[in-house]
Amino acid sequence: INTAHSENYSLEKAFDGLNRPWGMSFIDDHNLLVTQKSGEILKINLKTQEKIELDHNLKVLEVGWQGGMLDVLFHEGMVYVSYTEKRYGKHTTTSIAAGKLVNDRLENFKNIFRSDPPIDTDIHWGSRLAVKDNYLFASVGERAQGMAAQDPTNHFGTIIRLNLDGSIPESNPGLTTNKDWLPEIYQIGVRNPQGMAVSPIDNEVYITNHGPKGGDFFGKVSKGSNYGWMLVAWGGTDYDGSIIGDGSAWKPGLVKPIYRWIPSIA
């Protein structure tokens, strides 16, 4: 990681008065969308300092210290958000909704994806969004279910890929090479990936993933592959110091992270 030119950057306060902001996405040079964990989607003009709350009817549940309204992505007039959805009782999921932004209103705003199954836990939602080549990529955390990230018949611990309207691409692994996978799944074996971006250098999708006690990593999203949680912990251990798996940081057949941190940086 090159920090040689860090002296060329400075911090400037652009807007304040927000309540636990989680995601943001620019509409243009002056306007951006910001989510707050308590459930709001805000449109902010950095030039005029105007703040508008966009109405929606999503069942956002701010649960624990990680759940709530999470990422937001603006793409070609459409707004995509990921959030903690209350499904029934205390059972929740990582869900994605989308709609068109028209005159500061969200039109036809509705769910296009719900991770399954809904369960009663309050951590590890994943939830970061990115668009590449007219596909929507999203991360789903393993909801503290450990080895469930190795079971592609659920969405725990996965990267999913959808068409922009929420339909499933015919080239996804579950419809081609990995017929036992749920059709939305593109990659498995992650723990709690909360960073995702498309590189302007090679147009590939990259993620950052929270390891346990050690093992945070930066890596590439690749079709039909497996990062290995909880067969491996990328050099980390459980929080009580116990070994995860056989203690290996990596095994043959699994994807290697590009860079990992021990101890964890998050």
Protein language model regions, located:
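Beta-propeller domain segments
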Residues: 67-69, 142-266
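Acidic, Gly/Ser/Thr-rich repeat motifs that build Ca2+-stabilized beta-propeller blades
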Residues: 2-146, 198-211, 265-266
